[in-house]
Amino acid sequence: MRRAELNVTDPARIAEILNKCDCCRVGFWDGEEVYLVPMSFGWEKAGGKYTLWFHGAGEGRKAALARQCPRVSFEMDCGHGLRGAEMACGFTTAYQCIMGTGRLVPAETAEDKQRGLDAVMAHYAPGQTWTFPQEMLERTNVYRLEAETLSCKVHP
């Protein structure tokens, strides 16, 4: 990272930013171009590693690319604010962002799917308990992204 003073490494601060973000963009490579998909997500941290969870249909471009090339990048951001100045060159934007790379793998078992969907729902509706019908678990793709790299930056 070029501006080391903007780098955030404190796990509590990273968790705070993860919780504030409401969309995670996942970048897939199809061999010719990047396909960027905004997705709802959930997350968890265990053993110092971050895991992101996503869900989606079992068909379509995203599902096909997840099978074809599971190495992906991701980005999420929040806390945006334009900072004006007297000169155009002085304008800047405040933001908080998290970026990284990892492998997107499908959850295979009903238990893994439940765990992933629980993480997604906990992100958007914390403190509530949800049940998912077996039929829904069977037809919903749930993906786990184990972050191999993760960086966090805050530009005040």
Describe each PLM feature range.
Residues R2-E5, G79-P156:
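Charged, gly/pro-rich active-site loop segments
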Residues V8-D10, K20-R25, P126-Q128:
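Short Pro/Gly-enriched beta-strand edge/turn motifs at strand-loop
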Residues V26, R71-M76:
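Short conserved beta-strand and strand-loop elements enriched in small hydrophobics
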Residues L18, L65-A66, V120:
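A generic structural signal for nonpolar/aromatic side chains embedded in well-ordered alpha-helices
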Residues C21-G58:
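Short beta-strand segments
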Residues Y50-V72:
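Compact nucleic-acid interaction/catalytic patches
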Residues R61, A66, D77, L82-G84:
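Cyclic nucleotide-binding regulatory domains
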Residues M1-N19:
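Extreme N-terminal tail/first-helix region
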